[in-house]
Amino acid sequence: SDPLVDCKKCRERFRGDKLIEDAGGDPVGKTLAEISAMMQSLRIKCPSCGASDFTEARAFNLMFRTFQGVVEESSTAIYLRPETAQGIFTNFKNVVNSLHPKMPFGIAQIGKSFRNEITPGNFTFRTREFEQMEIEFFVEPGTELEWHDYWCKKSREWFESLGLAGDKLRFREHAAEALSHYSNKTTDVEYLCPFGWGELEGIASRTDFDLKRHQEFSGEDLTWFDQEKNTRYIPYVVEPSFGADRTVLTFLINAYAEEDLGEGKSRTVLRLHPRIAPVKAAILPLKKNEPRIVEKARARSEERRVGKECRSR
């Protein structure tokens, strides 16, 4: 859940923690009462009307609720998934029995998720329906922090290999008091967008919480038998979780540039990294009506063509 506050003057609703962040405060790990107190001490103003009169912060359920069938009652209530992770955990035993993987191993998935965001915005960065990419990486208990650091390193290498680097990319580790109840270490990968720091990926060590809960309520044995050590245990999980839509938007933001051509003229340029650019290079003859030049351009293009990445015109 997120901390919801209402402006008493204009009735607009906001996330209290985001208002505090925008004002330079740190709401991480704060209770609802502490969120309310921080908003008062920082004298936060409503982004819509400028008033500084908000309701007390209260928890807001992010899950979309609906009903199966024609009768709306508690027994038919269902929810749209807020993440793809749980579908992976429910299929853990199927994957193990079918593929017989060796520890450590991962299961990856990309798909739609739905969250009833209080304040969607910043184009596709924060929406109520979005695409998620998640990996549940199963490891031996006691090695999860080592694997957490491994995935942080791999994530940094991946983002930097596609052009996101420098002081606009940061890896922010959660303080102990700000960790989710299931996690013993979490790191957020954030990028400095025009609207502030935004999370692109969360890398969480989820311990064995999820598999334990699914085992408890399903009655299925979700333990793993290590033949080499002759031991049985419930695997721990390290989860790299990406927002696909916001990551694509961030690549576009990072590539966007406006060049000053002088004399009051400018042009907009999209400097995409070569690895994600749809066109790597183009050979363009200056004169289409001179066969010699056109033929030479085509010959050069054929020499450098790799698949369909280089196009001649």
Language model regions located:
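NTP/phosphate- and nucleic-acid-binding module
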Residues: 1-313
